[in-house]
């Protein structure tokens, strides 16, 4: 039921993420045998969303998006513990980056030239956007 609710596109994305975290905490409490952590945080949960809907979602990583926003001098702010605002701002920022990438035909052609029949074609460039964010955050 947790994944069904997470993938319910009729609800706000952060509300779904938060509900998944809460459900994970309940499962940990009930079945965790004293384990301290369930590891179902925003990074893992957005990965599930991206794997299910690769043309709609990006993979969130707080440390990465914070650097990306700073490097691009974006108006979005990311603060530790501000989970809802951080995820919502992350999606807005990456949507902006993705929109810019979609206008760069040279980059799109470079991407397409590298794809094989076994590669996901990434028609909406969400995966490319994740890769660009990763690159910005590291270099």
Predicted regions and their residues:
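Helix-hairpin-helix/helix-loop-helix acidic hairpins
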Residues: 1-40
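Charged/polar, solvent-exposed surface patches and flexible loops
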Residues: 5, 19-22, 26, 66-70, ...
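Generic structural signal for hydrophobic core residues of well-folded globular domains
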Residues: 6-10, 24, 31, 48-54, ...
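Context-gated lysine
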Residues: 11, 21, 26, 30, ...
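Catalytic DNA-binding helix-loop module of base-excision-repair DNA glycosylases/AP lyases
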Residues: 37-70
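Inter-helical turn/loop segments and adjacent helix faces that build the functional surface
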Residues: 71-81
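A basic, often C-terminal nucleic-acid-binding module that engages the phosphate backbone, implemented
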Residues: 80-139
């Amino acid at each position: 039921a947790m994944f069904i609710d997470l993938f319910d596109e009729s609800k706000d994305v952060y509300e779904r993420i938060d509900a998944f975290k809460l459900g994970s905490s309940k499962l940990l409490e009930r079945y965790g045998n004293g384990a301290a952590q369930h590891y179902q945080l925003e990074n893992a949960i957005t990965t599930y969303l991206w794997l299910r809907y690769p043309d709609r979602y990006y993979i969130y990583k707080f440390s990465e998006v914070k650097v990306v926003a700073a490097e691009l001098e974006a108006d979005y702010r990311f603060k530790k513990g501000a989970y809802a605002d951080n995820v919502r701002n992350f999606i807005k920022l990456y949507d902006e980056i993705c929109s810019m990438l979609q206008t760069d035909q040279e980059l799109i052609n470079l991407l397409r030239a590298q794809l094989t029949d076994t590669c996901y074609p990434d028609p909406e460039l969400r995966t490319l956007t994740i890769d660009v964010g990763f690159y910005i955050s590291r270099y």
